[in-house]
Design a protein with these regions (language model features):
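Class I SAM-dependent transferase core
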Residues: 1-95, 99-102, 106, 122, ...
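Residues that form generic nucleotide/phosphate-binding pockets
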Residues: 15, 30, 253, 355, ...
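Short, ordered beta-strand-loop transition motifs
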Residues: 58-60, 199-200, 330-335
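Conserved nucleotide-cofactor-binding alpha/beta core module
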Residues: 79-182, 186-193
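Class I SAM-binding transferase module
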Residues: 165-311, 400-403
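C-terminal target-recognition/interaction regions appended to catalytic cores
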Residues: 300-404
Length: 404
């Protein structure tokens, strides 16, 4: 079996390096050394070494709740984490145990990895898979990650592998001085993998990368959960910051589409998912997201802004009885770029569509601010300094100051 997987494993590492996701030799060596296929029993080795996320557990309604993350974003986050030999690392979200194994390789025999998951079955499976892969130095614990794991603190590095709505105080409190916390932070529905450094009285971002993860469950669960729309299985709306919305009215509006507007603005998929999505989230409190899964895609209610296998998603402005959603690409657009459109739904949908189009043009006119220049500072909720030049997002525990 070793000979069978060496080639596809090496090919994956080369692919990640060529794309810029792997940038250091120690991260490359971790991916070469750790056998992903042993953490995905039942998956063909060739599939295990594809640069794709693989769902490993679903809820009864079909929504995925655990997976082996896409290697590209795993590599990005490990580069952000900047793990050194001998360090103590806390991971929130064990999943299959593959990422914990990569971390164990990075810290070496003088370091230690503690990994937490809320599901007993996942922890037990991960323990077995770590043992089968010959990985030592990992303590896999069934616990709610919101509280961290005080027994192993302080940690030089903390990494969260599920989308976090807030920065939990326990993660910060268990982080060593000048330690680093990497987490997929949800900002009104847009996810960013943020590498924070712990300073005297706050966390300061050192790098930001767009990402997409399943949400944390348990005490730190995101109130921006997907809400089902109507009686169509697989149709959901993500509401920002627990915004009150008449879901039945939105479902009715989706059955009343209007004529699509064109913005004339050409974009790439990455720009839509991250840069434009973040601009809308920060500039309009009515921004939200529509998602269709499985058979709901065929109902053609959600404009196919971005499509993944088994899922279609778009960003929208949500009104009381109407909405407007970003739409595209059309079939004649080149694969790497398309002109974005705006589709109104329901009464007053045209007004929302014009407002949404204005945001697209404003983002374009501002030079399409990217995550490379994004700065995020996280303070305890009531301890942040006044800074009128920043966007301010308040969470239950944290005040985020955001600027480009």
């Amino acid at each position: 079996m070793g000979d069978d997987v060496t080639v596809p494993r090496g090919r994956l590492v080369d692919l990640l390096a060529e794309a810029g996701h792997v940038r250091t030799e120690r991260v490359a060596e971790a991916f070469r050394a750790v056998p992903r296929h042993l953490f995905l029993p039942g998956v063909e080795p060739a599939d295990a070494y594809a640069d794709e996320a693989i769902v490993t557990k679903r809820q009864s309604d079909g929504r995925p709740i655990s997976s082996s993350s896409q290697p590209a974003i795993m590599a990005e986050m490990l580069e952000q984490l900047d793990v050194e030999p001998g360090q103590r690392v806390l991971e929130i979200g064990t999943g299959t145990g593959y990422n914990a194994a990569l971390l164990a390789h990075l810290v070496g025999t003088t370091g230690a990895v503690t990994t937490l998951d809320i599901d007993t079955d996942l922890v037990e499976q991960a323990r077995g898979q770590l043992q089968a892969a010959g990985i030592t130095g990992v303590n896999a614990v069934c616990a709610d990650g919101a509280a961290g794991w005080p027994g192993g603190a302080p940690y030089d590095r903390v990494i969260v592998t599920a989308a976090a709505w807030d920065v939990e105080p326990a993660w910060v409190g268990q982080l060593a001085d000048r330690g680093r916390l990497v987490l997929p932070l949800s900002l009104r529905g847009v996810q960013l993998s943020v590498a924070f450094e712990a300073l005297d009285n706050h966390l300061a971002s050192r790098s930001v990368v767009g990402c997409g993860f399943m949400p944390l469950r348990g005490a730190a669960a995101d109130p921006d959960q997907a809400q089902p729309l109507g009686d169509q299985p697989g149709l959901f709306v993500h509401l920002a910051d627990d915004r009150p919305t008449d879901l039945s009215a939105l479902y009715a509006a989706l059955h009343q589409p209007g004529a699509q507007l064109t913005t004339g603005v050409a974009v790439t998929a990455g720009q839509v998912l991250v840069e434009l999505g973040l601009w809308l989230a920060l500039h309009d409190p009515d921004a939200g997201r529509l998602v269709a899964l499985g058979d709901a895609i065929d109902a053609d209610l959600v404009p196919a802004l971005i499509a993944f296998p088994g899922m279609t998603s778009t960003t929208a402005l949500l009104g009381a009885q109407a909405l407007a959603a970003l739409a595209g690409p059309d079939t004649t657009a080149p694969a790497d770029s398309f002109t974005i459109g705006v589709r109104p739904f329901g009464p007053d949908g045209t007004d929302l569509a014009q407002r949404l189009a204005a945001h697209v043009h404003a983002w374009d006119a501002a030079g399409r601010p990217s995550t490379a220049k994004l700065r995020i500072r996280a303070y305890p909720l009531h301890e942040a300094p006044a800074d009128p030049a920043t966007f301010v997002l308040d969470k239950p525990h944290t005040r985020l100051l955001i600027d480009w």
